Amino acid sequence: NVQQVPFYRIAHDAIRSGNWGWSHLTDLGANFVGSYSFYLLGSPFFWLTIPFPSESLQYLMGPLFILKFASATLTGYVYLHRYTKSRNTALIGSVLYAFSGFSIYNIFFNHFHEAIIFFPLMLAALDEYMENRRRGLFALTVFACCFVNYYFFVGQVTFTLIYFFLRLLCRSWRISLRDFLLLALEAVLGVGMACVLLIPSVLTVTQNYRTSNYINGWNAVLYNKNQRYLHILECFFFPPDLPARPNFTPESESKWASLGAWLPLFGMTGVIGWLQLRRKHWLKKMLWVLFLMALVPFLNSSFQLMNSSYYARWYYMLTLMMALATVMALENERVNWKRSITWTLTITAAIAAVIGFMPTLTKEDGKLTDVTFGLEKYPTRFWTYVAVSMICIGAVAYLFCFCKDSRRHFQRATLVCLSLVSVFYSIFFIAIGKTQSEYTYDHIIPYALNGGKNIDLPDLQSCRSDFYESLDNSAMFWEIPSIQAFHSIVPGSVMEFYDSIGVPRDVASRPKAAHYALRALTSVHWLFDDDHDDDYFAGESLDDPAMPGWAYYGNANGFDIWKNKNYIPMGFTYDYYLSRSDFNALSEGDENSMGSREPAMLRAVVLEDDTIRRLSGLLQELPEDRRNFTEESFEQDCADRRLNACTSFAYTNTGFTAEINTDRERLVFFSVPYEAGWSARVNGEPVDIERVTVGFMAVVAPRGEKVQIE
C-alpha cells in the first residue's frame, strides 16, 4: 500500500503524460529514471499497465501477481527440466521455486519478483552455451536481468561466477579459451545493451551515502546479533516470518531482510537427502558453498557489493538450487528418504522446542519474580508455523509410504499436496500480515484510494503538503507534492540537506513536527491529519497545534486540514547570505528538536565560498547580531521572504516555470534538489544554476516585472 501502489501510479502517469525527466511528486523532487528504474521501469509487468487508466492500477496488483508467480514457475521449469528425467518432476521443482518462502516473504516488495522470474533464464542460457555452444542467448538474458533490476543483477553476477567456476572445478564443464572469451563478450554485450537504464541508475545511486557503507572489521566475520544465526537456520525449515514482525528471533535485527528460503511441502527433506549421497556432484558442493556464504557476513554481503546493511535478498538463487536438489533427489533411487525425513523432523522439532519452551527468568533486587517460557514474540503464530512444518513433514512421509509404488501416482499426489500447501500457506501469510495493519475499510479504501478527489484546495499542485502521522506516500497516490516520502532512491542533495539539519534520511523523509522552519523553507502550505487515528496534530479538541503558525481550515476526505500561516510560495529571494563554514558553526538539531541552522536558512541563503565570490555584490553577509533565532523572528523571516516571492509557479514535463517581480538583480531560491543535469533560462536566456542552501538550487534574475524563469 505505501510503496508499490503509489509508485505504480506515479510512474504510470508520468509515462503516459511524457513527464520522464523530473518527478516533483517524489520527495522534494527526484530524477524520474534514476529513482524508478530500481522499482519499475525495467519491468515488463509495469509496462503492461500503461494502456489501463490510472484509476485501475490498484486493482491490477492482484492479476499482476498471478502473472508473476506463473512466470516464475515457467522460467524455473526452463532451467530445471534439463536436469530431470520427467517433465512432472521438473514441474514440481518449478512450483517449489516459484512459491518458496523467499517469494511469499517478498510479496510486500513486488518488484523483487522480476529478479525471481528472469534469473533462471540466465542460468539456463549459460547451461545451453556450455552444453551446446548456442550463442546469443546468454547475452540476451544478461541484458534482461540487468535491465529489469540492477540491484539484483549485482547478486546474480556473483552467483553466476561461483556457479560457472565451481562447475569447471568439478569437471562438470569444460571450455576452451576461445569459447570463454566469446562467453565473456556476450556478458559485456548484455550489460552494454542495458546501459540505457543502468547508467542513469548508477549516477543516482552513487549519490546515496548508504552505498559507501562497506562491511569491515569483526562485523565482516561474525554477525553482531547472535539471534541472526538461528533466524538464518530456521528460515530453511519453517514458513517465512512477516517482514516487519519477526517472531522466531525478535532481536535479530533482520526486519525486511528477505530471510525466507522454505520450500513448500518438502522443506529441507529433499536437500538433506541429496547432501547425504556419497557422490562428488557439483550441486552438492554448490549448496555447501552457498550455506557457508549465508553464515559469514562478508560472504553474504558479496551479493550486494560488500555493503554493510544486512540483507538476504539473494536467497531466491539459493532456493533454485535447493529446488534442483529436491527434484534430483526425487529421481535418484539411492536417496534415503527415511533418513532425510528423520533429520528434517529432528532439526525442526529442536528449533521449535528451544524457541517454544526456553525459560526466561526475571529478577528484581536479586530475587526471582517471574518465569516465562518461550522466546517467540507471538506464540499463537509461532505454533501455527510449527504445525505447518510438521504437517508438511508428515505429508512427505505419507507420500513415500503409500504413494511410491507408482511413479505417476506419486508425482500427481505430490503436485496436489504441493499446490495445496503453496496456496494455503500463502493465504495464511497474507492474512497474518493484514491483521498487523490498519483495517483497510476504515480509511485506506474510502479515503486514501480515492486520490483525494473530495479535497478542493486552490494551490495543491504549486505548493507542498504535509501529512501528519498518516499512511506513508499518501501524497504520492494523490499526486500532490509533499515533504513526506517513503522512497529509498532520491537525489544525494536531498540526503545532504536533511543531514545538515539533523533529520535522519535513510529510506524515508519523515521530518517531525519539531522541525517547523523546514515546512516554511520548502513551501508547505497544507497539512493533512488523519481523523481516524489517535495521533492528533492539535489534540482531540483541535486547539493545540504541534507547530506554530498553523490554523484549522476544515475537514474533508477523512482528514483534518490545517493551513500554514507562515507559508512562503515556491521561489523567493534573500537580502543576506551565510557562508557554509558559518552555517556549520550553528547548532545542527536532531530528529526530535530543531537547531539554529534550520531557521537560519529562512534569514539567509547558504553559499559555498566559490559561490560567494561569483555572486559578489548581490547579497550582504548576515551580520553577527542577526544570528539569534526565536519563534517570533521565524515568523518575521517568513513574512520577509513572502514579500519577494514568485507570483506564479507551475511544474512542467521538463521541470518548472516561475514568474517574479524584482526591484533589482536578485538571487531567486527554489527548494528543488540540485542535480548536475539541470539547465535554466531567465527571460529566455540561458543562466547558470547555483547550488545553495546545502543541496537546493537558485538562479540570478534581473530587475523587472514578470521575470520568466524556467
Question: What are the functions of these language-model segments?
Answer:
Residues 1-73, 95-116, 205-210, 218-262, ...:
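Membrane-interface coil-to-helix junctions
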Residues 172-181, 270-294, 406:
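Membrane-interface helix-loop-helix junctions at transmembrane boundaries of multi-pass membrane enzymes
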Residues 35-38, 418-444, 453-524, 563-637, ...:
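Extracytoplasmic/lumenal acceptor-recognition loop(s) of multi-pass membrane glycoenzymes
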Residues 2-11, 44, 179-180, 187-277, ...:
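Periplasmic/ER-lumenal interhelical loops and adjacent helix-loop junctions
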Residues 133, 152, 282-449, 703-710:
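Contiguous transmembrane helix-bundle modules in multi-pass membrane proteins
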Residues 72-79, 118-130, 158-166, 267-272, ...:
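Transmembrane alpha-helical segments
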Residues 66-82, 87-169, 182-202, 207, ...:
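Membrane-embedded helix bundles of polyisoprenyl
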Residues 619-710:
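Active-site-proximal, structured, solvent-exposed surfaces of multi-pass membrane proteins
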